[in-house]
Every structure is written in structure tokens, then in C-alpha cells.
Amino acid sequence: MFLGGFTSDMTGIKATALEQWCRGRGQAFVRFDYSGHGASSGRFAEGTIGDWAAEAIAVLDRLTEGPQLLVGSSMGAWLMLLVALARPERIAGLLGLACAADFTDYLLWERLDDRLRDRLQRERVITLPSPYGEPYIIALNLIEEAKQHQLLNRAELPIRCPVRLIHGMRDADVPWRISVQVMEKLSSPDTRLILVKDGEHTLSRESDLRLLTRTLGEMIESR
């Protein structure tokens, strides 16, 4: 089951590459769009981390059977962890790419200057340029609601399934040290962090995709 990133949709490079890889193995695979993303209904500016996590849990509950391997990209890796905390008995393993746990703080709020923070508090919703295409729509409610789901301020993350985290050391959006912090808090002794020295945030190059599928294959075979 694949969980995409903030503003991404299920037609992205990693989602479609994983589906193709799974089809080739006869492996079941689920990809979906959060509300306000891609083909799903809803307004993006009204979405929250809690909403999108609940939607991922609903997909897990309604569209899958038995223990599942979750693959989460960026924000999707944060949501992947929230799903695992909510449904531990349904999770066989987690594979996170450029894990953006708590990104609403260090990637959104903390990068706004005082002028933009004042504007966001007045207008509730603002747009910011994105290096990946369409401008980001930033809603104050997204940032405020996300505080309920923060992970990096917790002493421990009681997740005991196998976990693999892959992070590019040239990630200009989410520092690779975020994945280190997540790894340190996980209860699972079977946790590994793979750093890609020249990897950037999207991890969508052919070499990145090969690393992704190889790592996922190893997790499936070790179950």
C-alpha cells in the first residue's frame, strides 16, 4: 500500500513504478489519492494530517486483508507511521522515503518570515512557490491541527514491525537527520536507515527506484 506526499497524487513516478513492479511479481498493490489530491474530491486547503491519516486507515481497513507492507513518501511516511500506531496488528512492515514527520513545523511554519506568518494568520490560507510545479497552498488549520499528530516530540514510537527508511543526503526540503530522529524513537530493533549520498527529496531517479524495489523485495521475502 503506497502513501504519497504533500500535493502529490497516485499517478506519480514512485507510485506507478511500484505498481508496475508489484504486477510483475503478482503482488497485490494499492495506491490512492487523499482528499483534495489528484482524482479525489474535496478542497486541498481544507485537508489536515488527521484527515489524511484517517483516510489511509480507511483504505487499509476496507481495501486490504491481512498484514500489509506500507510504503510512504515524504508526508506519506509520516502518515505511514500514524497508521502503524493506529493499526499495529495490520502492519507487516514499513518503508519510508524522505520521511517528513512533523514537516508542518520545520518545512512550513518555521520557514515563513514574520510577514508571511502575519498574513497566514489573517487570511488563513496563502500560496507559496513550489520547486515541484503548482504553488503550495498553505492553510493555517493544516499547521495547527498537525500539532496533534507530531511524532518527534514523543519519547518513543511503539512500532515493532520491520522498518526501512531511505533518505537522500542532498534533500533540500526534509533534512536526512529527521529520519535519524525517527529511527531513534522506533521500538523495533529491526530498523535500518539507508542514506543516498547524492539523493534529493523526490528519490525518483532510476537508481532510486531500483533501491526502493530492491529494499521492498527484501522485506517481502523476509516475512
Each PLM stretch: what is its role?
Residues 89-138:
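Hydrolase active-site cap/lid region
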Residues 172-178, 204:
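Conserved alpha/beta-hydrolase "acid-adjacent" motif
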Residues 199-211:
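Catalytic histidine-centered segment of alpha/beta-hydrolase-like enzymes
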Residues 135-155:
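Active-site nucleophile elbow and catalytic-triad environment of alpha/beta-hydrolase enzymes
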